[in-house]
Regions:
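Sec-dependent signal peptide recognition
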Residues: 1-7
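Periplasmic/extracellular electron-transfer cofactor-ligation site
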Residues: 21-66, 72-77, 88-95, 120-128
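Sec/Tat signal peptide C-region and signal peptidase I cleavage site
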Residues: 14-22
Length: 128
């Protein structure tokens, strides 16, 4: 009985670990985002807006970036669930968005990307 319990706990622990967010893996996912977006203390708007302090921010509000009316008027406040839905299919979530990315479909990669982005506050400072 003790062996079965230990095996079950090991499986549960592994399953939790396998589905955890991994910021280091998310940084690798972000490589494809860098064509348009930046993060960090030297980040600036480019083809897309900078992504510092994304979570908790209202869509379409980064100063100095020209958003589509769709983004500005979406009423979206970015959180993990909204971001996950958006990044899977940006044009379905916000019809009329300027973002041309086809979408990231892999749930684990979305979680990892989220963990990476959440490290950066609005000033671009990376949490330790």
């Amino acid at each position: 009985m003790k062996t079965i319990l230990m095996a079950a706990l090991t499986l549960v622990s592994y399953a939790t670990y396998a589905h955890a967010q991994d910021a280091a893996a998310g940084e690798k996912v972000f490589v494809q985002c860098r064509a348009c977006h930046l993060v960090g203390d030297k980040a600036k708007n480019g083809v897309g807006p900078l992504l510092n302090g994304l979570f908790g921010r209202k869509s379409g509000t980064i100063e100095g970036y020209t958003y589509s009316d769709a983004n500005k008027n979406s009423g979206i406040v970015w959180d993990e669930a909204v971001f996950a839905e958006y990044i899977q299919n940006p044009r379905a979530k916000i019809p009329g968005t300027k973002m041309i990315y086809a979408g990231l479909k892999d749930e684990q990669r979305i979680k990892d990307l989220t963990a990476f982005l959440k490290q950066f506050d609005a000033s671009g400072k990376k949490a330790q």
